[in-house]
Amino acid sequence: MLLSFFFPFSCDDFYWGSKSLSFSTIKEIYNDLFLNGRWLGNFVAIFISHNHLIKALVVSIVITLIIYLIDKHEKISLWIFIILILLMPVNRFTQVIIWGSGFSNYMISTLLFISVYYLIKKYYKKNNSKWYEKIGIFIVALLNSLVVENITVGTLMILFIYNLIYFIKNKKVNINLIIMFIGTIIGAVIMFIHPCYLNLIFGTTINDRYIPQSSSTLFSTIKNNLFDGIFVNLINENILLNGFILFVFSYLYLKGKLKNITGLISFYLLTVMTILGGLLKFNIYNMFVTDILYLINYFYLIYKLARFNKEIWEIILLIICVILPLVFIHPLGERLFFLPYVLVIILMFRVLSINEVVIKDYVWLKIFTLILYVLLLYVNIENYRCEVKRDNYIKNNLDKKIIEVNGYKYPKYVWFDKIDGEYFGRYYDLYHGYDEKIRYEIRNE
């Protein structure tokens, strides 16, 4: 909570913070909560953007719940998991944790999606349930469908598959899975009846996003998304996660669980090539071939270690279902790949678990986590100090039409750090109630 208190507000935070939670008219509800169909995400964004303390409290609770749920249901090394989250690509960390609006959509949706998944696992084996359980799983499924589009669509696919498999195996329906499916359908309808999605279907660009309308543009979008979006965010930029995957395969080889040294060596080489390609910006077509070979090698090693183990392949199903909708929408942001990032971590710990290999939470892991936390705390305290100084300086110079302010000390840890842009000025003034004609410029230091 201490760390999240010092997360600076971004332009979007000022926009949402200027909204009131006391909706007095249907029009206000439509314009604010129903702005883009993300009812729950928009509500949380408005709620946390009024105050640093409120934001810190909500961020802390949600992140703690995610870690608790995963630690409760999976055999993980808690401290390795936390390290992998803290050291995810900086842009992704900034977009899903520090940026209030990004947190409200992508961290909240991760919590809800993981909750839905564990509820599916629980109630797949339990057809009977009490009335309050039915209400609870319906609400969770409904809320999960009111945050992020690809997760809504992905959850629909997952629940359809689980309901179908259950029916084929048992020649009857599972009422709990049906209730969750209905809740997800209702949530999807509430989300996608928004005019912006209908406009997207008919070719209108909304917030720089579009759906291709012809076979040529569809092919171009799929190509760009695969080459320069999905594979880059899933493979090339996840340097630490790639290192963890290498460690898992190597550790299992040393334990005698993985016996294919050729497959392991080729995976080492392909991992190095994908990382170098991401760092040095290799030709995207060459990278596409490398990434495809990487994935083939990766799934080959997974198969060698797990064969057709249900626990492994259902996580792979989850990853595919939440990523598949992203193939057809352009552009893609790093924040969309936070949930797949978490699912891959879970997958690798499951590979260890089914091979009866446990990584202990050594003291040095705890010390390293503490050092990381202190460093991140320092970075965000410095940015918070810059924010406070900036706000006080602007408040004392409102008589000027052009105000020069300092930028953040660590701008990579602030989303949309464009103080001299129109976007910042408009919503900053709206948030504070200042004259919207004031212009802001970065001071040359």
Labelled PLM ranges:
Residues 113-132, 169:
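Membrane-interface transmembrane helices that cradle and orient dolichyl/undecaprenyl
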Residues 1-35, 39-65, 74-77, 173-177, ...:
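Intrinsically disordered, polar/acidic, low-complexity terminal segments
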Residues 74-82, 129-134, 173-180, 257-269, ...:
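Membrane-interfacial loop-to-transmembrane alpha-helix junctions, especially the N-terminal start
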Residues 38, 83-121, 148, 281-301, ...:
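Membrane-interface micro-motifs in multi-pass membrane enzymes
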Residues 132-160:
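Membrane-interface alpha helices of multi-pass inner-membrane proteins
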